[in-house]
């Protein structure tokens, strides 16, 4: 079923991507997603940012975005893996060092995710043709995040029906 896609992108607590190479599935983590976004949505009394409504209606803090994007993890070559410890010891302290609203933190981190995922998909591209990417996981329900990822990559994102997501 998944062989018709160049990549499978899972947007769960962390974004991870997998592909089949010589009948072997290779996978790696790209960045935190719902682990961080849900943390800040919970502060607002919400389980998550429903369809990216908060992120889409608030500004991105460019300074924070640049600091997040400059983290050395993003320069490592795959395979690479992330854990909640890295979020707690690296990501959250950076975000919390900014005196900005929770909504702005959500907007900025959503953009950070989109940029890192787009960069990762663009860097793995092996031909001049657009890649077909199957998107699954809870983050696939975040329309704003999907729009922002599409803005930062040359791949075609495919969202299956809700049951598969």
Report residues per predicted region.
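Active-site metal-binding loops of divalent metal-dependent hydrolases
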Residues: 13, 138-140, 162
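Phosphate/pyrophosphate-binding loops at sites that engage ATP/ADP/AMP, CoA/4′-phosphopantetheine
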Residues: 99, 119-130
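Conserved phosphate-binding/catalytic loops in two-lobed NTP-binding clefts
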Residues: 150-165
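Short beta-strand scaffold segments in enzyme catalytic cores
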Residues: 15-20, 38-39
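Conserved phosphate-binding catalytic cores of ATP/NTP-utilizing and phosphoryl-transfer enzymes
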Residues: 1-6
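Glycine-rich phosphate-binding loops at beta-strand->alpha-helix junctions
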Residues: 130-149
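Conserved ATP-utilizing enzyme core subdomain
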Residues: 26-114
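General beta-strand structural signal in soluble alpha/beta enzymes
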Residues: 7-11, 26-30, 159-160
């Amino acid at each position: 079923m998944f062989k018709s896609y160049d990549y499978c992108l899972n947007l769960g607590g962390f974004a991870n991507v997998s592909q089949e190479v010589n009948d072997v599935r290779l996978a790696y983590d790209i960045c935190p997603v719902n682990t961080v976004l849900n943390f800040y949505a919970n502060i607002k009394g919400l389980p998550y940012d429903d369809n990216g409504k908060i992120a889409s209606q608030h500004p991105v803090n460019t300074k924070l975005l640049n600091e997040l994007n400059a983290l050395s993890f993003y320069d490592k070559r795959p395979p690479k893996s992330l854990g909640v410890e890295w979020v707690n010891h690296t990501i959250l302290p950076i975000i919390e060092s900014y005196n900005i609203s929770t909504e702005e933190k959500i907007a900025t981190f959503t953009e950070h995710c989109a940029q890192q995922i787009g960069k990762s998909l663009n860097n793995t591209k092996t031909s001049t043709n657009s890649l077909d990417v199957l998107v699954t996981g809870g983050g696939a329900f975040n329309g704003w995040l999907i729009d922002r990822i599409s803005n930062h990559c040359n791949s075609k994102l495919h969202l299956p029906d809700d049951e598969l997501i």
